[in-house]
Amino acid sequence: MKSLLPIIALVLFVFGPARAQNPEGVWEGEIQDPKRPTVINVDFKTRRVSFSGTAPTTITQPALPSNDNRVRFQVANGAQTLKFAARQDGTRLTGEMDTGSRTIPFYLELLPSLPKPVGRAEAWQQDIDVVISRFLRYDRSYTAARREATRARLQALRAKVDRMSDQAITVELARAVALSGNAHTRLYLMRNRTEVRRVPIRVWWFGRELRIVSAATEYANLIGCRVTGIGRWNLPSAFSMVRNIKAGNASWQRYMSAYFLTSPDLLFGAGVLPNPERLPLTVSCGGRTRRVTVNPLPLRRSSTPVEAWWDLAPAYPHVDGLKPALAVEKAPPYLRHPDRNYWVEYLDAPAIVYLQYNRAQEMSSEPMADFIRRVTRTLDEHSIKGLIVDVRFNTGGDAGVGTPLVEALAARSKGLPVVVLTGRATFSAGITHAAQWKQFANASIIGEPAGDGLDLWSEGGNLLLPNSGLTVHYANGFHAYSVKDYPAFKPYFSDLNVATLVPDRVVEVSWSNYAAGRDPVLEAALARIRKSS
C-alpha cells in the first residue's frame, strides 16, 4: 500500500580504527519497526544497498576497517540521514538505526553464497530454499500452523522438482505461498507482473457466465461468446483448478481467474491442459456451441502491472491490438476513463456528483491537491443531493494519496447521502478508502463484494528468486479496519472501525447490461439517493 522508506540517495559506510577485516558478502535482515519492518539488503563488497526489494543504490564511499567489530553506515535520504550502528558477532550484525527523531533496532545476517546450480532441478531447489529460509522469515501473515504447512509443502515440492514441468513447479510454488490465506502474500505471475504466456483473448465474469470481451483480429468471431469449457473440463471444474494459485476471497478469485483462464502455461501447470502450446475452448455463440483452439502469444516478461478490468473499457489502448466487444460511444461512465486514476462528473438531472477513483496513485496531470480543490468547487457551485464514489476498479497503490480526498469530501458532504460502489477489483488501498467512506461519511455500499476483507496484511516487499527470476511478495503491516481487536498484531499499520463492507445491495453487471452500455450498479446508487432526498 505504501513504502515506508523513500528512495535512497547516498550511503556512507564508516568503520572504526583500521585493523580488523570489513564484513564481506551479502547481508540481509530487518529494520524492526513494530508497525511494519523493512527488509534491508547490504552488499559490503560491491557497496550496494536496497530496502524491501527496491532497486539497489550504489555505495560511493569506500569502507574503512574496524578493530572492535563495530560497523556504522549512513543513508542520506534527501534532507534526512539514517544512521546505522551495529556490532558484528560472526555472521550477524545487531544494532540500531537512528532517524534523527527515533531509534529502531535492526539486524543483518550473512546470506550463504549459492553455487552455480548443476542442472534444472538444483536451480529450482535453490529458489525453493530462498522461499523457505528468507521469505517465510519476513512474511507476518502466516499463523504458526500455516507457516509449518507451507514449509512442509515446499519441502515436498523440493523433493520432486526433477519429475515436474516448470509450469507445474511454478503453480505448486504459488499454491504453497498462498497457504497464508492473505491475498497480498503471493508469487507474482500475472497482474502485478507478467511471468507467463497468455492467449490473445480476454474474458470477464458476468454472473455465472464467462464471456470473451476482447480478442485479436484472427479470433474476432469469438467476441461476445460464452466460454463453457476449457480443454476436457467444463468451466466450473476448470475454474476450481486454478483457484488459490493466489490467496483471496471469492471475489478476488473471480478477478484473478480472468488472468489464469487465459494462460496456457498456468492451465497446463494446474492440470487443466495436457499441452501448454494451445488453449482448446468450448464456446457458445448465438445459440450454437463449438470447439475452438487459441494459440498463445510469445512470452513478454514485464514488471508493469496489467489490470483485467481494462479489458472492459473500449477506449483502453491494448498492447496486442485486441478488438473490444463494446463500442467506445456506448461505454457507460465507469468505463470511459481507464487512463485516469481519478476523475469527477456532475450529473445534472439528479444533481449528484459522481467520482471514480481507479488507482491510489497521484496523477502528474492533476495532483490530488488540485483534484480536491476542483471537486470541492463542484460541490460548492451546485445544490448537491448526493455523492457517489466508485472504487470498483481500485486495486490499491498508496492509501496516503486518497485519504485527504476522503477527509475533505466527508466534511463537505455532511447530511448528504453518500454511496460507495465496490466490486471484485476493490482491493488493498481501494478497501482502505471504501472503509474510510463508510466510517467518516456513513456511506452505503452498492455493487459486488470487495476483493478482500476488512482486516488484512499488506505493505512488505519483494524477494527475487535467483534462478527462475520469479518474485515472491511478503506482507508485514497489519491493517485493522473492522471492529475486531487483534492484540497480537499491535501496533497496527493502519486502523479504522467499520462493522462491515458487505454491500447494502448486491448488484452485478450482466452480459446484456454490458453489451447495451448500461451500468445497473450506478443506476441502483442513483435510485438510492433519489429515495433518500
Where are these regions (language model features)?
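Short, surface-exposed linear segments at secondary-structure transitions and domain or protein termini
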Residues: 49-50, 67-71, 91-95, 113-118, ...
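Short, isolated positions in well-ordered beta-strands
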Residues: 56, 104, 211, 235, ...
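Flexible, low-complexity junctional segments that flank or bridge functional domains
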Residues: 20, 45, 99-104, 109-386, ...
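Central antiparallel beta-sheet cores of small beta-barrel/beta-sandwich binding domains
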Residues: 21-89, 94-106
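Positively charged n-region of N-terminal signal peptides that target proteins for export
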Residues: 1-4
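Conserved acidic, small-residue-rich alpha-beta core segments centered on
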Residues: 381-388, 392-530
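Bacterial N-terminal signal peptides
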Residues: 6-14
